[in-house]
Regions:
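Catalytic cores of soluble metabolic enzymes centered on carboxylation/carboxyl-transfer
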Residues: 1-187
């Protein structure tokens, strides 16, 4: 267990295993999904999460920190989730990640999912010959976002807006109790 090993190290103890006990098998890829606007320099895009449907299936895991109906707040890290895939080969893991990104639905905020899709499909990434300057060198090749808004997104926005208005009208504005005006003696 990773947490147990972290606690052991924190207490000054050695790891409970050696490198000889670690075997490599398969490949795993993680894409961090942020509420960020890739087309504007990865600026945070806070707002409501109107729809959040995560991909599923063998070798696909999503560790989400935001739920549908929640909000990405301006004062916190805009991470929505970690999307992790694993497969027997690197090529299979990349293909699985592409499918996972394509089936991941988030409506309400811009996300880094299109950027993850761009990276997974880029020939330099696929070749394995990339470095930490990938974004700097290749982000300009990414197509601008599609401004077409699917009808389901429009419908989700309309429903959310109606629900917000209904909630506000039920709560009503705070009212200040008025005291009856009473004249004072001698005034």
């Amino acid at each position: 267990d990773l947490v147990r090993e972290q606690l052991r190290i924190a207490m000054g103890e050695p790891l409970g295993f050696t490198q000889d006990g670690v075997s490599m098998r398969g490949h795993a890829i993680e894409c961090r999904v942020y509420a960020e606007d890739v087309s504007h320099g990865f600026l945070p895009d806070p707002g409501p999460i109107l729809r959040h449907r995560t991909p599923a299936g063998p070798g696909v895991r999503v560790d989400a920190g935001v739920l549908e109906g929640g909000r990405v707040e301006v004062h916190y890290d805009p991470m929505i989730s970690k999307l992790i895939v694993s497969a027997d080969t690197r090529e299979s893991a990349i293909a699985r990640m592409i499918r996972a990104i394509e089936t991941y639905e988030i409506i309400g905020v811009s996300t880094t999912l299109p950027f993850g899709h761009f990276v997974m499909n880029h020939p330099v990434f696929r070749s394995g010959q990339y470095n930490t300057h990938f974004v700097e060198h290749f982000a300009g090749e990414m197509s601008p976002p599609d401004d077409h808004v699917p009808p389901s997104a429009i419908a989700a926005g309309v429903v959310w807006r109606a629900a917000e208005r209904a909630r506000r009208s039920q709560d009503g504005p705070e009212r200040i109790a008025r005291q009856a005006h009473r004249p004072t003696d001698g005034a």
